[in-house]
Amino acid sequence: MNFNVIIDHTLLKPQATSQDIKILIEEAKKYNFGAICIAPIWVKLAKKELKNTNIKIVTVIGFPLGSQISAIKQKEASLAIAHGADEIDMVMNIGKFKEKDFQFIINEINQIKKEIGTKILKVIIETALLSPHEIADATKLVSSTNADFIKTSTGFSYRGASEQDLKTIKENKSEKLAIKAAGGITNLADMENFYRLGATRFGTSKSVSIIKNLTDKKNKY
């Protein structure tokens, strides 16, 4: 498996500067990563720097808490696309989900998908804050929307994706809904395991070291 092309090479630290983003972009070019995942403020810069490449620009909406007003999330998504984003990773409203206001969740996701049209929409459910039963319910909920992916984590909670998270999501998702694993993916073993469990996209800031380990592994044989 060519993992490079299904990695979203990620830099979402609040202290990241334009120079840090340029370094991220050069790494993405060097290692042929499928996409970079950055904060909305850097999308215009990335669009310019990635001209004449096939590397996609992923940005985040309602990040990292998900509790912004829906209209703000919609506007943020619309502006991100206008600035050159190819894909949107939005954070589900965790509080509304916890109090079982499921129609709110469905409406918000579908409104943002309508806003971005044919662009890819991933919904972050923040598995660290959910019980296994809630992860199952959230997966079914996202499956009922027009979202393209369900994503495990922001990387800003107390843990990222786990094997059990992936198993629960895989067991409860619709056939059309793809899985992005993110948060705490620091080594090749995790990525290979999550891939076997159904993840077809990966968000990680450790992309370079993971791919270097993969190359070393191949060179041993």
Curated annotation (Swiss-Prot):
BP GO terms, sorted: 2-deoxyribose 1-phosphate catabolic process; carbohydrate catabolic process; deoxyribonucleotide catabolic process
Pathway it works in: Carbohydrate degradation; 2-deoxy-D-ribose 1-phosphate degradation; D-glyceraldehyde 3-phosphate and acetaldehyde from 2-deoxy-alpha-D-ribose 1-phosphate: step 2/2
Xref: NCBIfam families: deoC
Organism whose genome encodes this protein: Mesomycoplasma hyopneumoniae (strain 7448) (Mycoplasma hyopneumoniae)
Principal location: cytoplasm
Domain of life: Bacteria
Gene name of the encoded protein: deoC
Any GO MF annotation of the entry: deoxyribose-phosphate aldolase activity
Gene3D superfamilies attached to this UniProt entry: Aldolase class I (3.20.20.70)
Keywords: Cytoplasm, Lyase, Schiff base
EC number: 4.1.2.4
Catalytic activity as recorded in UniProt: 2-deoxy-D-ribose 5-phosphate = D-glyceraldehyde 3-phosphate + acetaldehyde
Record keyword Cytoplasm present: yes
Record-stated family: Belongs to the DeoC/FbaB aldolase family. DeoC type 1 subfamily.
Protein name as catalogued: Deoxyribose-phosphate aldolase
Active site positions, chain numbering: 89 (proton donor/acceptor), 151 (schiff-base intermediate with acetaldehyde), 180 (proton donor/acceptor)
Physiological role: Catalyzes a reversible aldol reaction between acetaldehyde and D-glyceraldehyde 3-phosphate to generate 2-deoxy-D-ribose 5-phosphate.
Stored HAMAP family: DeoC_type1
